[in-house]
C-alpha cells in the first residue's frame, strides 16, 4: 500500500493538523488500522493522537481517499471529535491488541 499526501494544513483554532491523502493498494481495501500505521510513519505522529475521519473508495478503483486529523492534545481531541469517529478508531486499536 502506498499513501500520497494531497494536502496538509495546520488548524491552530482546533489545535490539530488536517491531512487529506490518497491510498493506493492491491486487493481488498485496507483497514483503518493499516492506514493509520502507515500514516503515523509518514507524518511522524503519535498513534494515539491520529484520528482517521474518512476512508472512501470509489467502486472498482484500487485507491481510497482519506481524511485524517492529528491533534496536539488528547483532551482537545476528546472534546472536539465525534464519539463515533473516536470509537471507530479505538475499535481498530482494540482489534490490534487482541491479535497480539
Swiss-Prot record:
SUPFAM superfamilies per record: Ribosomal proteins S24e, L23 and L15e
GO molecular function, one term: structural constituent of ribosome
GO biological process, one term: translation
Gene Ontology cellular component terms for the protein in this record: ribonucleoprotein complex; ribosome
Keywords: Ribonucleoprotein, Ribosomal protein
Similarity field: Belongs to the eukaryotic ribosomal protein eS24 family.
Name this protein carries in UniProt: Small ribosomal subunit protein eS24
